[in-house]
Every structure is written in structure tokens, then in C-alpha cells.
């Protein structure tokens, strides 16, 4: 689960080192400010390049379809890198060995949309 460019090297490393990546969750494509062009997230782009299935739900909260999909996936582990959504508590028990959250800064002190920039200021 991830969205920005920061998450791309982690997904590439997992893929290149032979780990089985069943699915990638990322934010849905967003309209850019100029021209209102629809832009995919960097993670969606690399998932397409590597031919890894991906999903782009607008929310996981009260989302039975995604809950059931993840449940049926029967994954061993989930890695979250700057996903940009709160993962509902009920999802946490769906993955056998749990979730690993990779964050660009110390949590909870430097959380939010710009943790690296805030830690520098």
C-alpha cells in the first residue's frame, strides 16, 4: 500500500528480490491543478510497468468489496509506505503476520502530508 514516488524504490526492491507481490493498493488517479489532466500515482505507474495487480479505492472505510478482497487474498504480510489513507482496524487482522509501516520520518512527531519538510524546518 503506497502512493508517492517515495514508495517506488521499496516496491521495486521487493519485486527485484523475488518477493511475491500479490497486489498493490494506491490512491485513485487525481486531477492535476493545471489542465485538469488525470494523473496516476507513481506506485500505480510502476505497478503497471512491473505487471503487478493494483487497486485504487477512494476509501477503505466501510468498503466491503476491498475488505472481502483482502480477506480472500490470504496475504502473509502487508507493507504500507505513505499510503495516504487510514487503514481501518478490522483490516489489520486480515494479514497473517501483520502490517509493516514504513514512514519517511519519526512518528508520531512528524506525521502528516509533509513529514520530511516539517522535520527540517
Regions flagged by a language model, labelled:
Residues 1-121:
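One-carbon transfer enzymes
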Amino acid at each position: 500500500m503506497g502512493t508517492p514516488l517515495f514508495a517506488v524504490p521499496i516496491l521495486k526492491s521487493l519485486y527485484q528480490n523475488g518477493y511475491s507481490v500479490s497486489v498493490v493498493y494506491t490512491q485513485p488517479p487525481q486531477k492535476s491543478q493545471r489542465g485538469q489532466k488525470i494523473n496516476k500515482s507513481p506506485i500505480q505507474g510502476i505497478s503497471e510497468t512491473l505487471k503487478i495487480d493494483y487497486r485504487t479505492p477512494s476509501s477503505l472505510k466501510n468498503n466491503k468489496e476491498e475488505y472481502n478482497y483482502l480477506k480472500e487474498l490470504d496475504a502473509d504480510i502487508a507493507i504500507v509506505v505513505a499510503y495516504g489513507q487510514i487503514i481501518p482496524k478490522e483490516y489489520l487482522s486480515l494479514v497473517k503476520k501483520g502490517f509493516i509501516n514504513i514512514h519517511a520520518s519519526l512518528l508520531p512527531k512528524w506525521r502528516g502530508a509533509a513529514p520530511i519538510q516539517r522535520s527540517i524546518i
